[in-house]
Amino acid sequence: AREADSRWIGELWQNYLNTVAANRQIPAQQVFPGAQGLLEGLTKTGGDTAKYALENKLVDALASSAEIEKALTKEFGWSKTDKNYRAISYYDYALKTPADTGDSIGVVFANGAIMDGEETQGNVGGDTTAAQIRDARLDPKVKAIVLRVNSPGGSVTASEVIRAELAAARAAGKPVVVSMGGMAASGGYWISTPANYIVANPSTLTGSIGIFGVITTVENSLDSIGVHTDGVSTSPLADVSITRALPPEAQQMMQLSIENGYKRFITLVADARHSTPEQIDKIAQGHVWTGQDAKANGLVDSLGDFDDAVAKAAELAKVKQWHLEYYVDEPTFFDKVMDNMSGSVRAMLPDAFQAMLPAPLASVASTVKSESDKLAAFNDP
């Protein structure tokens, strides 16, 4: 596992170096010359990191906030109303879109851990996403579907609900293209298998073709404080509890279910990628691949971004003019309130709420939320 992690982390790091080097038009070695090289460079500048960045062309100039404001005001003018240089927040900026007439390409998002039931904030709801895909399938104006996946996986059951609906869309004659974001692993890849075509970013983390199950028990923790439980039941399976070790029969049943799910997973991938379960098993077993490696292993069709995926969907659907039709949940009352705020205000809200807490509590709250979000993903039946 350590070797596998080192491999993909190394590839992501190299992709980062190459991207920065290309944009700054300098050698990758200049972006990061290694720990010793960086130390030598900082020694020459007397520890001045800003000067080091300038001399190595990592930045174009050094300036204070006041100097930057003065330059931007000179370039764009001053707004007396906003008391700032004329600008618009990135969050408030709206792209000009064509009129929503004629043929369309449906866009469905799968962002977050995949869970059973309805969608919740930050997670993918199996039923919700499947319903969105169904709506796109039944709309005669929608000529193709793009599924944007940015998910680490989650529930097998929910993943299958989404996969089945996507397969139905393809069977109905609508081309399906998957656009992989930063991550499309495990269940994120499961839901991608029905696609006619898969586009990944070179740095996408995908694969992780495998299944595991977790049942938390605390009998050892209770034992350490002298707490024990007992009882009677008609079967070892009738009274499974977190206060006692999982019965051997239940452990074996769980293992059989996991093994069956894994066979199902590699068979789905094999059928989708025109391979065999045996060949897929060699690159599966939970291994994580970057987009580049996934392309080499035949798990994706090409490297690119969302726009490339949309262009491919239009090509497969043989449409020359189209607009994008986004399928999202109906907004709640809270969503509508948030929509009435400026984008920049919405962006600051999470930090504002956290700022209300004392520093130690804010740190703990952030950690607890992160860990609870992980546990929340384990909601398979």
Task: Enumerate the language-model features and the residues they cover.
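Gly/Pro- and small hydrophobic-enriched strand-loop and loop-to-helix capping segments
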Residues: 59-69, 195-210, 300-310
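Catalytic-center loop of serine/cysteine hydrolases
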Residues: 1-23, 172, 185, 195-272, ...
